[in-house]
């Protein structure tokens, strides 16, 4: 009896198997889709730690399970086909270059941890590709699962917004994070999953197509409410690309009516979404609530070039690193360490960006330009595979259907990677693995068994005569020399069995090593969270030994790039164990451009009374971080002790030129100048401060006080005599000295004011009024002087004018004026 032939795999990949799906494979696909999302924080400082650990454990489980499968055991192509595909090969070469760049690493522990993350996502893509090649229906399963989760994400967002509005509050979009670590990851998770809904809409039928349309609509609505500009642009590009795809697709079928229907539906859905969003902003959001995330779509678009200074500065510093290290970079995971060489001189504090906010640039910075090109080629090859299949003459839907999802998926991921750092976010990294796994699985043909008939459809990556195509010329030439090299390598024969065994053992060893590394990192992250929460209290409360003994060997810098030794030092400082702190700090070389260890070393030496050593390390900090004002204060404190005022004043003057809009430099500098006897310099410094900060009350106040002191200084002894006589109530003597002083310095308003009081107490009201007039002419009026003029006027019989002055004095807060106003001005 003749067996019914099973349908051969097409150019898009695996065979279509008619039997039911294998539960274990289905479970693994669903697990890869959701494992990073559902893994809890476990009270760590960075939820990425436990999520990467969970993904690594899933990789080990998957690999072990796949090795035991009979249908895979005797087929080397099941495990090695990934590496003969140009996408998989580009990814593998990226891993190899990442390993090579270890030789450039400043901090090898960070490189090990970072490589473990890269390898974990790579393995996830590898496992997904093997499973998807068994049966394309697993892709549908993954698409449905992730579309359902996309709907859950969207409705979680809508629920939080609705709850806030019902309570009469603003939506507080920034605080909404669902099961993710923050708002930005939620926004990315929504956007990067949209291609799954697009795929269901484009290629499924009936209920699944309707579900795809519904999911696409709510995802678009959620993207609007998240108010993320990068994803606004991404949504526009994705929708335009989809409409172009639909247009060409139905044009070739002569189904213009269908094209119009689909296009109208998509555009109408977007228009309705924008309308609902705008109406919510206008009618439901509280009128008195306003933030970055509660402005209209087009208003938000207008700010797309604003607020990007931090990203732009970060990218600029990254390009400097790339220029210095174009071949192998600064080492994987070392961007946050190496970039401080350029970030420190412009940062006034220790709040650093520990990510580039652009994975393409960060990869080039850390592992070289070629690595970044290989990363880009993953996206390019996936897109070209789809375009080649789609534009092929007489192309059937079956030839490009399965390539649509990875192409559009990587397009969405690319937007996130260009503006953020999804490579370090396992929730998004797992989606990348799904897309890359699908791209590899469905762009490679199975090699026929010996003696069997070859497939009648050539694999898209093999070198065959190029048929007439509608692909534009430039697209057909994109796979250049690099593509040809990868294609050549992809034709290397599969490994012999004797090589497969050691490779399998090696792969398992790396998987186990990654898990061990993530466990150690997990333990460190738990302590990092405790330390961070303790630091936010008024005083450190946790026991020092918990951190001194508890932190593992690595990582030796925190998730925020702070050397771990600094965290330990804070507790030793609290316990006044400065010698122990010095021993730890001096032995640390985890981050050579981070000056926190040197800052604490200087402080430890100071606390031990070793001021010269303290000054040496303070100057080391200053050399790298000239805008860190606390360090300048410490330097000036020691210089002042050594009576080296000119040196200290020069430091402060330099600081005020570099940070002209910071009041602390002007105020501290003025006090320092005053202490050193340089009043003229103090006033000059405050004049400069008033120029940049004209409304700063403290600068104006200090300038006024120092101006008085500068006028008094040449005749200080005489002025002090006048004041002392006034205090002793010897008003005649005080008038004598004040008059003598005024003859020498006629421009000191305070001298006229005090002499006016003396004349009043001597009952010489007219002379008192004359001096008060001078005070008012100089603009020195205050509550006290209004009250003084009032009592003079009362004594001179002008109660109407006196009451006006008493009332003004009360308004200005003069307490002595209150009884005068009550007694002489209120009607009985």
Where are these regions (language model features)?
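TM-adjacent membrane-interface loops and short helices in multi-pass inner/ER membrane proteins
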Residues: 182, 303-306, 310-353, 360-374
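Register position in tetratricopeptide repeats
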Residues: 536, 574, 607, 641, ...
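Flexible juxtamembrane loops connecting transmembrane helices in multi-pass membrane enzymes
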Residues: 175-176, 238-239, 259, 274-317, ...
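Alpha-helical transmembrane segments of multi-pass inner-membrane proteins
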Residues: 2-7, 14-38, 55-67, 95-103, ...
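Transmembrane signal-anchor hairpin modules in multi-pass inner-membrane enzymes, especially those
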Residues: 1-100, 106-113, 123-147, 200-213, ...
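Canonical tetratricopeptide repeat
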Residues: 567, 600, 634, 668, ...
């Amino acid at each position: 009896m003749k067996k019914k032939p099973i349908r051969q795999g097409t150019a898009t990949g695996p065979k279509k198997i008619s039997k039911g799906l294998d539960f274990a494979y289905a479970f693994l696909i669903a697990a890869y889709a959701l494992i990073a999302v559902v893994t809890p924080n476990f009270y760590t400082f960075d939820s990425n730690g436990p999520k990467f650990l969970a993904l690594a454990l899933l990789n080990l489980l998957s690999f072990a399970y796949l090795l035991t499968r009979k249908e895979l055991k005797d087929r080397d192509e099941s495990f090695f086909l990934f590496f003969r595909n140009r996408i998989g090969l580009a990814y593998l070469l990226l891993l190899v270059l990442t390993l090579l760049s270890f030789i450039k690493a400043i901090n090898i522990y960070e490189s090990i941890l970072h490589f473990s993350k890269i390898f974990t996502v790579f393995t996830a893509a590898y496992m997904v590709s093997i499973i998807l090649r068994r049966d394309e229906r697993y892709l549908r399963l993954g698409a449905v699962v992730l579309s359902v989760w996309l709907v859950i994400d969207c409705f979680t967002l809508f629920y939080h917004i609705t709850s806030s509005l019902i309570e009469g509050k603003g939506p507080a979009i920034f605080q909404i994070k669902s099961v993710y670590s923050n708002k930005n990851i939620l926004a990315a998770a929504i956007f990067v999953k949209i291609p799954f809904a697009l795929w269901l809409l484009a290629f499924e039928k009936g209920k699944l197509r309707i579900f795809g349309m519904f999911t696409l609509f709510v995802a678009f609505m959620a993207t609007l409410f998240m108010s993320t500009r990068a994803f606004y642009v991404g949504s526009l590009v994705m929708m335009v690309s989809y409409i172009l795809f639909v247009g060409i697709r139905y044009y070739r079928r002569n189904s213009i009516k269908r094209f119009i229907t689909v296009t109208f539906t998509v555009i109408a859905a977007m228009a309705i979404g924008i309308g609902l969003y705008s109406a919510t902003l206008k009618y439901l959001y509280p009128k008195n609530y306003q933030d970055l995330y509660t402005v209209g779509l087009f208003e938000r678009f207008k700010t797309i070039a604003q607020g990007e200074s931090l990203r732009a500065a970060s990218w600029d510093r990254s390009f400097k690193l790339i220029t210095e290290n174009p071949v192998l970079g600064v080492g994987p995971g070392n961007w946050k360490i190496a970039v401080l060489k350029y970030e420190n001189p412009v940062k006034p504090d220790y709040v650093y960006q520990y990510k580039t906010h652009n994975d393409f640039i960060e990869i080039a910075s850390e592992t070289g330009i070629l690595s970044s090109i290989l990363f880009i080629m993953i996206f390019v090859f996936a897109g070209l595979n789809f375009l080649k299949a789609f534009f092929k003459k007489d192309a059937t839907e079956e030839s490009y259907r399965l390539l649509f999802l990875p192409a559009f998926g990587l397009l969405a991921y690319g937007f996130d990677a260009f503006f953020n750092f999804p490579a370090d976010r396992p929730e998004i990294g797992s989606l990348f693995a799904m897309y890359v796994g699908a791209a590899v699985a469905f762009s490679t043909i199975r090699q026929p068994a010996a003696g069997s008939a070859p497939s009648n459809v050539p694999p898209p990556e093999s070198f065959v005569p190029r048929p007439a195509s509608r692909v534009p010329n430039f697209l057909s030439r994109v796979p250049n020399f690099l593509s040809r090299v990868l294609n050549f390598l992809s034709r290397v024969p599969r490994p012999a069995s004797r090589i497969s065994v050691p490779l399998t053992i090696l792969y398992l060893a790396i998987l186990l090593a990654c898990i061990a590394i993530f466990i150690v990192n997990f333990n460190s992250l738990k302590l990092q969270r405790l330390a961070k929460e303790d630091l936010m209290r008024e005083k450190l409360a946790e026991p020092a030994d918990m951190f001194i003994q508890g932190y593992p060997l690595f990582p030796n810098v925190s998730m925020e790039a702070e050397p771990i030794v600094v965290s330990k030092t804070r507790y030793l400082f609290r316990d006044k164990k400065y010698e122990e702190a010095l021993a730890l700090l001096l032995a640390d070389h985890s981050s050579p451009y981070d000056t926190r260890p040197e800052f604490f070393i200087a402080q430890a030496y100071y606390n031990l009374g070793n001021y010269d050593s303290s000054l040496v390390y303070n100057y080391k900090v200053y050399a790298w971080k000239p805008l860190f004002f606390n360090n300048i204060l410490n330097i000036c404190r020691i210089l002042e002790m050594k009576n080296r005022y000119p040196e200290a004043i020069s430091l402060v003057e330099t600081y005020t030129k570099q940070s002209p809009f910071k009041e602390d430099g002007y105020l501290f500098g003025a006090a320092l100048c005053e202490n050193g006897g340089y009043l003229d310099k103090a006033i000059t410094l405050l004049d400069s401060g008033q120029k940049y900060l004209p409304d700063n009350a403290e600068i104006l106040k200090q300038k006024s006080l120092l101006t008085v002191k500068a006028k008094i200084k040449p005749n200080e002894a005489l002025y002090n005599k006048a004041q002392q006589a006034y205090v002793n109530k010897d008003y005649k003597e005080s008038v004598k000295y004040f008059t003598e002083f005024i003859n020498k310095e006629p421009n000191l308003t305070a001298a006229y004011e005090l002499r006016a009081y003396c004349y009043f107490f001597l009952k010489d009201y007219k002379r008192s009024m004359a001096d008060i007039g001078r005070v008012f002419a100089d603009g020195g009026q205050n509550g006290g002087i209004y009250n003084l003029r009032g009592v003079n006027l009362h004594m001179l019989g002008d109660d109407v004018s006196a009451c006006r002055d008493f009332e003004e004095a009360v308004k200005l807060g003069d307490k002595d004026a209150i009884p005068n106003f009550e007694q002489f001005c209120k009607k009985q």
